[in-house]
Structure formats: structure tokens, C-alpha cells
């Protein structure tokens, strides 16, 4: 049995609160059970040097965990003087995932930065970050359109992510920390709304997994992501753009 009594295919309760802070063009607090991430989308004119003059935009991301988002305090990476490898890996994953959501040519020479700050961690912080950041990105793109700077939103598709894994020999969707830390296989799946996959990260922590188990986990992720896309759509229906 799972820690909270969920079915193997069931995702945690999801809450997506838009317009969470007032300054960012897009701001979302996303909650997957006890995992809580603040996702802000900031719009700036101009693009990185390697894109100048190409008539396209850029989407990038930064990720961090507050010192007491975990069971014991972790020093801020700024205090240590450098980002850890895990942090850099996750923020690159978030950026790659959200770039897939946008037609960068239609965005024009704007840069959108997605800042994902983990307030409370209980597993799945990177997948929650992608899911929440996509909603913040939609609001930021709509702000550019509302300001008359773009004729239409360059959004191509919603993007969401979920973790799956094998725990005690059972495939499970949306792992909590206690499940993640005990998983024989751990996988993160990033998907577009039409079912096409952007990224699959899978690791066998103990016994290697079979091809059939891989397909089973991907099917489990696809089912969970349908619920997550529903949560995104429901959030975007609420609260008129501020």
C-alpha cells in the first residue's frame, strides 16, 4: 500500500494557484500533495547573444530549493558559491521542456525566464516545476499579447511532467519522497498535450528494468499526465488575466 493510500496509477491532489505574486508576468504556486513550488515567468526584451538578429525568442529557467524545503536545512547554493550539479541538470530540463511549448520564431526577440523555487519538497519537485511553470508561461505570453507586442500567443502546446517508478515490485505514478527514495526504478516523463514525449529520464537504482516494465511505466505516466493536464486547463479557466 502507498503511504497515503493512493492507487498505483493515482497522482497526488494537485492545486495550481495563478497570479500568486504581483510583479511577475506569470506567477503560479503549484502543489502536488506536500510538494510546493513557486513558478514565476519574467519577460524581457532582447535575446542571448547567440540568437541576436535571428528574429526568434528564448525560454530559459532557473531552479532552486529554499534552505528548509527539506527535512533538514540545506545551505543556500549562493552561500556555497556555486550551483550543484543536480540544480543545473534540473533547470536545464525545465528550460528544454518549456521551449518545446513555444514557437520561438513567433515569440520574436523576447526572453522568458522561468524561476522555479521549491518551498516544500516531498518528491517530484522537477516535474511539479515543469507543470507549474507551463501555466505561468501561458500567463506571461498572454500578457505580451495584451500589451499589443504580439498579435497572438506563440504557445504551441501545454507541457506537463510526472514521475513514475517501481516500488516494492509495483509500478507507481507521482512518487512521494519515501517512495522515490525506496524505488528500484525511478523515471521522469515530460509530455505534450497530444501525447508526444519531450523527455524521458529513467534510472534503475537496483535491479535493471525490462522493456515491458519500461512500456508499463510510460503508460502509467501517460494516464497520470491526463489528470495533470486537466488540472492545468482548469487553472487557466479560473481568474481572468490580471
Swiss-Prot record:
What is this enzyme's catalytic activity, as reactions? tRNA(n+1) + phosphate = tRNA(n) + a ribonucleoside 5'-diphosphate
**InterPro entries attached to this UniProt entry:** ExoRNase_PH_dom1, ExoRNase_PH_dom2, ExoRNase_PH_dom2_sf, PNPase/RNase_PH_dom_sf, Ribosomal_Su5_D2-typ_SF, RNase_PH, RNase_PH_bac-type, RNase_PH_CS
The record's annotation in Pfam families points to: RNase_PH (PF01138), RNase_PH_C (PF03725)
Q: Which EC number(s) are documented for this chain?
A: 2.7.7.56
Question: Which key words tag this protein in UniProt?
Answer: Nucleotidyltransferase, RNA-binding, rRNA processing, Transferase, tRNA processing, tRNA-binding
Which biological process annotations from GO are given for this protein? rRNA catabolic process; rRNA processing; tRNA processing
Among PROSITE patterns, the record links this protein to: RIBONUCLEASE_PH
Sequence positions that bind phosphate:
86, 124-126
A molecular function (GO) term: 3'-5'-RNA exonuclease activity
Under PANTHER family, the record lists:
EXOSOME COMPLEX COMPONENT, EXOSOME COMPLEX COMPONENT RRP41
Please name the NCBIfam families in this protein's record: RNasePH
- What does the UniProt function comment say about this protein? Phosphorolytic 3'-5' exoribonuclease that plays an important role in tRNA 3'-end maturation. Removes nucleotide residues following the 3'-CCA terminus of tRNAs; can also add nucleotides to the ends of RNA molecules by using nucleoside diphosphates as substrates, but this may not be physiologically important. Probably plays a role in initiation of 16S rRNA degradation (leading to ribosome degradation) during starvation.
Indicate the family of this protein: Belongs to the RNase PH family.
Q: Which HAMAP family match?
A: RNase_PH (MF_00564)
Q: How does it assemble?
A: Homohexameric ring arranged as a trimer of dimers.
- Could you tell me what this protein is called? Ribonuclease PH
Species source reads Photorhabdus laumondii subsp. laumondii (strain DSM 15139 / CIP 105565 / TT01)
Gene responsible for this protein: rph
Amino acid at each position: 500500500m502507498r503511504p497515503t493510500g493512493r492507487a498505483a496509477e493515482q497522482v497526488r491532489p494537485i492545486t495550481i494557484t495563478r497570479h500568486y505574486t504581483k510583479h511577475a508576468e506569470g506567477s503560479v504556486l503549484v502543489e502536488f500533495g506536500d510538494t510546493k513550488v513557486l513558478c514565476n515567468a519574467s519577460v524581457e526584451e532582447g535575446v542571448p547573444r547567440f540568437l541576436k538578429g535571428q528574429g526568434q525568442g528564448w525560454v530559459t529557467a532557473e531552479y532552486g530549493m529554499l534552505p528548509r524545503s527539506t527535512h533538514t536545512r540545506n545551505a543556500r547554493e549562493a552561500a556555497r558559491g556555486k550551483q550543484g550539479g543536480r540544480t543545473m541538470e534540473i533547470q536545464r530540463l525545465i528550460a528544454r521542456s518549456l521551449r518545446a511549448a513555444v514557437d520561438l520564431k513567433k515569440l520574436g526577440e523576447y526572453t522568458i525566464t522561468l524561476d522555479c523555487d521549491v518551498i516544500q519538497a516531498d518528491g517530484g519537485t522537477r516535474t511539479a516545476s515543469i507543470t507549474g511553470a507551463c501555466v505561468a508561461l501561458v500567463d506571461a505570453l498572454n500578457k505580451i499579447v495584451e500589451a499589443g507586442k504580439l498579435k497572438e500567443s506563440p504557445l504551441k502546446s501545454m507541457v506537463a511532467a510526472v514521475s513514475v517508478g517501481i516500488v516494492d515490485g509495483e509500478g507507481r505514478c507521482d512518487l512521494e519522497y519515501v517512495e522515490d527514495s525506496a524505488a528500484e526504478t525511478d523515471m521522469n516523463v515530460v509530455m505534450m498535450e497530444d501525447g508526444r514525449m519531450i523527455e524521458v529520464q529513467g534510472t534503475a537504482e537496483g535491479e535493471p528494468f525490462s522493456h515491458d516494465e519500461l512500456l508499463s511505466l510510460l503508460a502509467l505516466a501517460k494516464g497520470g499526465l491526463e489528470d495533470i493536464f486537466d488540472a492545468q486547463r482548469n487553472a487557466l479557466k479560473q481568474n481572468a488575466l490580471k
